[in-house]
Design a protein with these regions (language model features):
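Bacterial N-terminal signal peptides
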Residues: 8-19
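Sec/Tat signal peptide C-region and signal peptidase I cleavage site
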Residues: 20-26
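Boundary/entry segment of secreted carbohydrate-active catalytic domains
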Residues: 26-66
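Conserved, mostly hydrophobic/aromatic
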Residues: 34, 61, 102, 144, ...
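Noncatalytic carbohydrate-binding groove/subsite architecture in carbohydrate-active enzymes
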Residues: 43-47, 51, 134, 138, ...
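Substrate-binding cleft and catalytic face of glycoside hydrolase catalytic domains
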Residues: 56-218, 254-256
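Aromatic-rich peripheral "rim/lid" segments of glycoside hydrolase catalytic domains that contact
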Residues: 77-83, 133, 147, 161, ...
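Short strand-edge motifs at loop-to-beta-strand transitions and within beta-strands
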Residues: 431-435
Length: 467
């Protein structure tokens, strides 16, 4: 075949793909992962939390395991005399019930092994995040692999390693050069050795787990990616770093109060509205020989902040709309294989706060308030619906999350009075559908689904957004 023929075929393929509606290029197998650390850690609320999450149709749980929480003498500057690869030397009691509860329900578990770390496991032993020792981390991962074994479906290394509360230093003091990416690379390689030594040589391990935006103290996610993979600003290899072989790339694509369609000006930031930036960066890194081609993306932590957060919080109605829109954006990207919901209940307020801003400085991204009161997003989560205006049309995307196969679902609309039926359609085998309707000013939409037991379930009413 001549050199021109593949180019013609590739061009034809691109034209054909471009002609498809956006959702037609969606991931063929996108899963939803839930994270509810407070509710699942508390024995008094654990069973109820598991049952409620299960009622949504979710079958995957993310747990962040902090090394310092299980290690002996974590606050000591001097390492205790023990075999760090022996799982019996650690206290796993904070995490075992969560893992076992998920496994008993047939769920998949993503375990993120992260800092902060034991003080004795850092260079200089001055705190719990500065330059963790790769050799010590390897030993800990070996112990974790031996303890949990195949109960864990996927592992991930470090939570937000581009954030100073989890890893230091982020930058050099003199030239403000990013340092955390190379520190992290060594920790990831140490973890791979640890899994092999712990009897899991074929463990599915995700890399990165980066937060979405950079600052003077936080390394931007794409800057972090390039540094971790030994690439310059143009994605050319620097030095002799070997190719890494993670099972996927993990990222936390949080957005701002502007909503999921927000596009940050900083080109190295990656929020949900510009997830294509991460796809492009991964493809360029693959062409440079730094990672495998077509690495799948796992959006392992996500949520929409609501009131009473006074900085990033949106109204309760917008929280429901924005979360559904964000899930649609993830669904539309064929490289995104996993999306997530962070929190069942909001974080509790800070009792020692001296201002309203400090009082709600945690996460208000839950489906319920911190007291357990249902938010509108609790109703929309099992039946998300996102409506985009496209000229004279409205593109409706929805999901019956609890569905176990193709199922009928009805779209209803209101213009301020009662609800009327717009149409009934049948979802695909995973519960998704996409359908167009004529735009009518003032209309709002919701999903209505009849469960197998005969119950009629209504989703939250959503507005139409211009993409």
């Amino acid at each position: 075949m001549s050199r021109i023929a593949p180019l013609i075929l590739a061009l034809c393929a691109l034209i054909a793909v471009a002609a498809l509606p956006g959702d037609a290029r969606a991931s063929a197998d996108q899963s939803m992962t839930f994270e509810a650390p407070v509710d699942l850690a508390n024995p008094a609320t654990r069973t109820q939390a598991f049952d409620e999450i299960s009622s949504f149709g979710v079958k995957s749980l993310r747990i962040v395991m902090l090394w310092q929480n299980v290690a002996p003498a974590a606050t000591s500057r001097i390492k205790p005399d023990f075999d760090a690869t022996d799982p019996t030397k650690y206290d796993w009691s904070a995490y075992d019930p969560q893992v076992d509860g998920a496994v008993a329900r047939g769920w998949k578990v993503l375990l993120t092994v992260s800092g902060p770390v034991p003080r004795w496991a850092t260079n200089g032993a001055k705190d719990n995040v500065t330059r963790p020792k790769p050799k010590e981390f390897q030993a800990f991962v070996t112990a974790a692999a031996r303890h949990f074994g195949t109960k864990i479906s996927r592992w991930s290394i470090w939570n937000e390693p581009n954030q100073p509360q989890f890893l230091l230093p982020q930058y050099s003091a003199a030239k403000h050069t990013p340092l955390s990416p190379r520190i992290y690379r060594n920790l990831f390689l140490a973890a791979e050795r640890g899994f092999a030594a712990g009897g899991l040589p074929n463990a599915q391990v995700l890399i990165a787990e980066t937060s979405p935006r950079g600052t003077g103290k936080v390394v931007a996610p794409l800057t972090f990616l390039r540094g971790m993979l030994c690439l310059d600003a143009n994605y050319h290899k620097q030095g002799s770093c070997a190719e890494l072989h993670p099972a996927g790339y993990a990222h936390h694509a949080y957005t701002t109060a502007s909503g999921p369609l927000f596009k940050p000006r900083q080109p190295n930031d990656v929020t949900i509205g510009v997830i294509s930036r991460l796809v492009t960066a991964l493809d360029r890194a693959a062409r440079a020989g730094a990672i495998p081609a077509k690495l799948p993306i796992h959006l392992t932590e996500f949520g929409i902040q609501s009131t009473p957060d006074r900085i990033q919080g949106v109204s309760l109605a917008k929280q429901a709309d924005y979360r559904s829109i964000a899930e649609r954006l993830a669904y539309q990207n064929p490289r995104v294989v996993a999306f997530s919901q962070y929190l069942l209940r909001d974080d509790p307020p800070n009792p020692n706060a001296t201002s309203p801003i400090d009082k709600y400085s945690g996460f208000e991204s839950g489906l319920r308030t911190n007291t357990g009161k249902a938010k509108p997003v609790l109703t929309s989560f099992p039946l998300p619906l996102a409506a985009f205006r496209q000229g004279s049309k409205v593109s409706l995307w929805g999901l019956v999350r609890v569905a176990t196969g193709a199922t009928p679902v009805t779209v209803e609309y209101t213009s301020g009075g009662g609800f009327k039926k717009l149409f009934t359609t049948t979802t695909d085998a995973r519960g998704y559908f996409t359908r167009d309707t004529t735009f009518r000013s003032g209309r709002r939409y919701r999903l209505t689904w009849t469960a197998p037991d005969g119950r009629t379930i209504h989703g939250t009413t959503t507005a139409v957004y211009k993409r």
